[in-house]
Amino acid sequence: MRPMLMACAALLAATLHPPSLHAQTAPKFTIDATWPKDLPKDWITGQLGGVCTTAQDQVYVVNRRNITDEEKETSISAPSIIRFDPDGNVIGSWGDETTVPGSIHGCFVDQQGNVWVAGNADATIQKYAPDGKLLMQIGTRGKFDSVDGTRRGKGLNTARDQLHMPAGMVVDPGNGDIYVADGYGNRRVAVFDKDGKFLRQWGRQASEEETRGGAPGVFAEVVHCIAMSNAGLIYVCDRQGNRVQVFQKDGTFVRNIPIPNASGKLPDKRGTAWWVAFSPDREQKLLYVMNGGTEQVHILDHASGKILSSFGRPGHQAGNFTHGHTLAVDSKGNVYVAETDWGRRVQKFKIVGGP
């Protein structure tokens, strides 16, 4: 009887808690050292403030053009926005620092193929057609939502027509509403309609106690990224709060996804939650997070928020990161990482196995 009882108990446990039925595993990646191909003659990039992909797996990177004087003696500063085909060949480019937002930061491609960019040294976001034509701008270049109207002024977090060093944006494919991570100077998500009219906002500066407690709808410091899931939820990087906060479109808080650091100390000066992207399957079973604090890409089970695997380490070799800053995922599940500071490159990580 005893063996039969044990077998029945095991069967009951397996029925109630089937560990393998819904277990999520992480895919494996390898660096694609052949991507991108050589840039046009004499081109050189500065810090790459963002990377984004199109439905056709073309890749855009945004270039801050901040090369050194020595580099200017031998090279040409590449344009601000560079477009690659899936094989890594340059197929288009436009922009310079006089037209794009200052310290260009983040990019997003909407359903019509338009390219959106922000800038963490400016007060605007911009929308470009694929041929480089400027279609829309929200905010005024050099006019900040701060106490004195300058970049260094304390953020007011209130303006309906101004921003303060926005970090990124996402466009709702259903109605064209624009959600802005605002940003380095403010502590909010600002929402505009498809024509740029202000609709609503949420978020404010968090106290240290609120940051340590994971309080909803407040931000430790930089509101560093924003993304929308297929379910219509808004994912926001609370970078120094070491978490991704998830909201409904009206700002109602849904949950925290912690990205812990080794010390557990909060707020975290460097922060861990730098950028997010989703796996390309309809359910978006995986969430990818760029952790600039450890120079790693984390692969998370989307439903539970559990970190399944990570890749990357500090360094300059292929597959390493030097200020890994933003990431994007294409339709095949390949991951692209753009680096700022002295990294100044984009790397492709090819999916080679897994779910």
Regions found by a protein language model. Give the residues of each.
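Bacterial N-terminal signal peptides
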Residues: 6-20
